[in-house]
């Protein structure tokens, strides 16, 4: 078992753009993730790589970087920032950090709410 639990849920942005929501949760007793955890980490099966991926969860920067790289074959990859949302509960913005799609560009902020299924 990995020290980082990954859960994927099909979802859409507030504008209706479909994507895969990748929720990351550290599951160690101390709440601390070590770099060695990356060696046993696997992206969940069933990802729809023709859609974008939003990575969300409390993570060290190096772990988020690893997940961005691991998801690079997706149409686009974004990271979630709750400070970029609106007054809706669970809202935030997903900042696009990599793209192969004409529909989004690096630096775009996609408004979304965290799916209930990952809470």
Q: Model segments located where?
A:
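Acidic, metal-coordinating catalytic cores used for nucleic-acid/nucleotide bond scission
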Residues: 58-62
């Amino acid at each position: 078992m990995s020290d980082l639990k990954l859960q994927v849920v099909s979802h859409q942005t507030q504008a209706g753009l479909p994507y895969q929501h990748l929720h990351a949760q550290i599951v160690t007793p101390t709440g601390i993730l070590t770099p060695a955890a990356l060696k046993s980490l696997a992206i969940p099966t069933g990802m729809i790589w023709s859609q974008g991926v939003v990575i969300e969860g409390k993570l060290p920067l190096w772990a988020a970087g690893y997940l961005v790289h691991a998801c690079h074959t997706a149409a686009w990859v974004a990271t979630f920032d709750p400070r970029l949302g609106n007054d809706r509960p669970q809202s935030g913005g997903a900042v696009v950090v990599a793209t192969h799609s004409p529909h989004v560009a690096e630096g775009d902020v996609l408004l979304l709410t965290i799916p209930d299924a990952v809470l």
